[in-house]
């Protein structure tokens, strides 16, 4: 999931690939403002971390029991790594949703969204308003993660 979201972010933020959006969904002044460029760095580095954490644990099997057993269950370690990957995936998805909200505003297509998509868009915009000036986005990313973790949307 995290890899798919990161690739979609790359498409969304890369103006020469998508052909319809400004670089990094920048709604400010190109050359002066960065849009979501720094957030893409976060998504990419988080994706790289997830890829590293997704390596199988069995390659780290350690003999034990006086070398009588060479198959060691790494279930707990794997579960902890999987939990980290899931948490990281929320961060990547949050950045993707932020980019999609900016893209919807740039394209002015709010009225073309389905009723459910429009509801989600409006909920997101209630805590992540349209922006043109550069500011740190870590608080918005955390709010988006909280939103994505809500059970009923």
What is the meaning of each model-derived region?
Residues 2-153:
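C-terminal auxiliary extensions adjacent to catalytic cores
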């Amino acid at each position: 999931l995290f890899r798919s979201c990161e690739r979609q972010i790359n498409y969304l933020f890369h103006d020469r690939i998508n052909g319809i959006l400004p670089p990094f969904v920048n709604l400010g002044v190109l050359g002066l403002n960065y849009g979501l460029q720094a957030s893409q760095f976060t998504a990419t580095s988080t994706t790289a971390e997830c890829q590293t954490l997704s390596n199988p644990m069995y390659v780290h099997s350690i003999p034990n029991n006086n070398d009588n057993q060479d198959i060691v269950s790494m279930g707990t370690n794997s579960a902890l790594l999987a939990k980290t990957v899931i948490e990281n995936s929320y961060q990547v998805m949050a950045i993707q949703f932020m980019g999609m909200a900016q893209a919807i505003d740039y394209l002015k297509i709010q009225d073309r969204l389905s009723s459910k998509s429009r509801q989600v868009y409006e909920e997101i915009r209630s805590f992540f308003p349209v922006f043109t000036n550069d500011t740190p986005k870590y608080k918005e990313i955390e709010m988006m993660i909280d939103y994505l973790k809500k059970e009923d949307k």
